[in-house]
Amino acid sequence: MAPPVLRPENALKRADELISVGEPQAALQSLLDYITSRRIRFADPAAIEPIVFKFLELGVELKRGKVIKDGLYQYRKHVQSSTEGLKSVGAVSRRFIDLIEKKMSSEQAKANAEESTEEDLEGGVTPENLLISVYEQDQSVGGFNDEAVTSWLRFTWESYRTVLDLLRNNSQLEITYSGVVNRAMQFCLKYNRKNEFKRLADMLRQHLDAANYQQQKSKQYTVDLSDPDTLQRYLDQRILQVNVSVKLGLWHEAFRSIEDVHHLLSMSTRDPKPSVLANYYQNMAKVFFVSSNYLLNSVALQKFYDLYQQNPKATDEDFKFYASQLVLSALSIQQDDLPVVGYDPLARLAGFLNLESKPTRSQVIEAVSDSKIFSRADEPVKKLYELLNSDFDVNTLKESLASLLPELNSKSYFTQYVEPLKSFTIRKAFISASKQFGSIKLDELFEHTSLPSPFDLSPLDLEKSLLQAAMNDYVSFSIDHDAGVVSFMEDPFELLGGSTATNADDEQRNDDGYEETHVEEEPEPILTRNSAVRTQLIELAKALKETEGFPHASYVDKVRMARNELIRQNNAIIASEKEAAEERARQLEYEKQSASGVPLTAEQVVEERQRRMKEEKEAAEARMEAEARRRAEEKRERELAAINEKTMLKMIEDINAKGLIFIDPKEAKNMTLEKFKKLTVELVSKDKKDLDERMSHAFKRVDHIERAYRKLEAPLWEKDAQKQKERDLESYNKLKQMMVEKAKKDHEENLRIHDRLVKIYPSYLHFREKVIAAQKSQIEALRAENAAKLEAAKNARLQEVRQQRYNELIARRKEELAAKEHDDRQRMLQDRLTKERKERERVNKEKDEAARKQREIEEAVERTIKRNVSATPAPPVRSAPPARAAPPPRASNEQVASPAPQPEKKLTYAEKMKLRRAGRA
């Protein structure tokens, strides 16, 4: 059967006719019917594209998102079977996005123009027009007419979602999909659409997960994530996603995007551009800074600085800014964390920066102190670095910072690091005070650690910082609040000794009392949790005191050594328990093997045989499954080889048809895509080499010919040059003579004019002063007149504005009074109509009541008549007619004739109804 004949121009003509008569909805529906019809499967997609473009223009103009979505999905369904159809889908999608962005820009410009229009002389949102906007339907005050823009924003966002879902996970539409993703992110950034950006990020993750899932299936046009170009596009999308997340302030979404980028970087074999990677590390540093992770913030800034050095447009001011920021970020890192047991979450975050382990503060400081970075930092930053990285004296710290902080406050990069630097400085001041003072008044301690602005803290905040330092095991102290004295301790086990003795005495007294009251009982010893911990700490203290260097170490070093020893002991306990468990498992296995040497019963033999048969059966089934998998794999390999051979043959024919190189088609069977690329490159390189050799020979030949020409032309050119030189010298001399003569004449004329003017110059000055004096009063009069006119114009304008506002107020009041009178008339009319309606209802009700009573009376009369009729057996005798002459007497045997029957009188309708009702009763 031949395909149907399509006339796309007729559909466009029909749509234009409907639009011209004011029926755009009908035009849109007609185009939708044409696009969704199955006939277009047989058409060339390029011929259908104008109809789809017209359909999109109408749909965007009418804001019919659902209709557009249905049309695009149906169009893709009909044309996706061919590569040309998918290209058409990409072109249609790009056109749709262009239309919606253009429309969104025009609507936004229109809204901005409406907001910028001044409503009165004051303009803007004033208290008066705010009150007016409450009761007026036309809320034209700026800031109240954003609903139209919001609806277009929602429509634009739904359009982006539709296009992304239309293009997702198709290898032929990857480039278009990537472009739409970038434009969608720019849309969210431009209009500050945070919620839409979150949904966009989730959608992109779902698309990537679907692409990963499709890798296991052999579908047509599946996205190949092993392709470097495809993977690079996904990576660029995620890096842009990180950038937009940071600009929008979506830090959680930025962190999730960083995870996506790290995953894609681990899969990629191609390094990103240094500029892109530098921007990525800069955004990562911002994310870590917001999360108060100053350690990784500094590492990320260091990686950014290393990449930024490759920027050819970077200036010395930029290097100074970023170097100073990097040094401050390193100084903001808190003291090196003490060893912890278990999983450290920072180890995973360090993996995002391609670090094998979590760095320490000392390592970061050492890297920052490199001359390339430190030498470019500002001088105040260098001084702060030298101050905080030395064992400063708490007594002189305040004076040093007082002269240094004002210089740093003027730097833009210093503000964001004030809080972490303050925390680090105060904590280090407490550590220094704990080393310098054994005990000190609380007020004196706060006086020593009170730093100048912006490092100043209240006494309550200082006490909180001191307690936080103790909780983190950087200092240990006891506070006597009665005396207001703080006592620092140099040994972390110092409090343990006193508390141990006290608790031991308490336990001894409790044990004595228990024995006195329960002499006959012998309870088992019970170790409480506190006593067990205390015992373990005492043993740890004894072991550490025997360690070299422990007695003379600082408090922090002692805590670090204690924690390392605890970690070592815990690891030893875990290893011993693991070894014991393995030993128990080996013992159980040995006992099982030993028990198997006992002679078995007949039942056990049968069970063993059945078990063996079951195992053999399972092994046979496993072999059969493995064989089936092997055959399926071989079949799949053969199919792939056939497809590869067909593809290679097609590519070889295409490359041979171009005529640049020739490849034997017989080699298609043993050729892969990589071999084809390599062979093509080799052949092209060989042809290029031959061409280069021929071109080089030709260039040499042309060079020799040119040399011969120039050798013959050289004497002629020399003669011509000598003649030209003589002609130029002659022309120069003539021109010089003319210029000298003209200059002399001009000079003489100027001297003559000067002599004439010098004679009349005093007269000119006298005349000038006379004219100025004469015109001065006139000028002042004109100025006064103009000032009066200006004042009169101002007053007239003010009066006009007041009169205009007064007229507007009078008109508004008249409108209000007219509206009120109209409402009163309407209300009176309504009341009158209500009264008339009630009166009619009352009259009708009375008539109904009278009719009911009349009906009851009639029914009673009818019942009475009926009873009377039933009580009388014969009808009443009618009166005889008037007497006539008596007839003659008849004989006795003569029969008397009976009178003729009288005709019955007809009953009326009312009488019939009465009789019928009486019969029913």
UniProtKB/Swiss-Prot annotation:
| Basic and acidic residues: bias regions | 506-517, 818-865, 903-913
Stretches with biased composition (Pro residues)? 873-890
The UniProt record lists the PCI domain at 319-493
Q: Which residues form a coiled coil?
A: 562-647, 693-868
Q: Which GO terms describe its molecular function?
A: mRNA binding; translation initiation factor activity
Q: Does the keyword Lipoprotein apply?
A: no
Localization recorded for this chain is: Cytoplasm
InterPro entries on file: EIF3A (IPR027512), eIF3a_PCI_TPR-like (IPR054711), PCI_dom (IPR000717)
Q: What biological process terms from GO does the record include?
A: formation of cytoplasmic translation initiation complex; translation reinitiation
Keyword tags: Coiled coil, Cytoplasm, Initiation factor, Protein biosynthesis, RNA-binding
Its GO CC terms are: cytoplasmic stress granule; eukaryotic 43S preinitiation complex; eukaryotic 48S preinitiation complex; eukaryotic translation initiation factor 3 complex, eIF3e; eukaryotic translation initiation factor 3 complex, eIF3m; incipient cellular bud site; multi-eIF complex
Q: Where is this region: Disordered?
A: 497-524, 818-921
Q: Which Gene3D superfamilies match?
A: 1.25.40.860, UVR domain (4.10.860.10)
- Pfam assignment, any one: eIF3a_PCI_TPR-like
Q: Which family does it belong to?
A: Belongs to the eIF-3 subunit A family.
Describe the function of this protein: RNA-binding component of the eukaryotic translation initiation factor 3 (eIF-3) complex, which is involved in protein synthesis of a specialized repertoire of mRNAs and, together with other initiation factors, stimulates binding of mRNA and methionyl-tRNAi to the 40S ribosome. The eIF-3 complex specifically targets and initiates translation of a subset of mRNAs involved in cell proliferation.
Relate the assembly described in the record.
Component of the eukaryotic translation initiation factor 3 (eIF-3) complex.
HAMAP family the UniProt entry points to:
eIF3a
Protein name as it appears in the record: Eukaryotic translation initiation factor 3 subunit A
Query: Species name for this entry?
Result: Eremothecium gossypii (strain ATCC 10895 / CBS 109.51 / FGSC 9923 / NRRL Y-1056) (Yeast)
Per UniProt, what is the name of the gene that codes for the protein in this document? TIF32
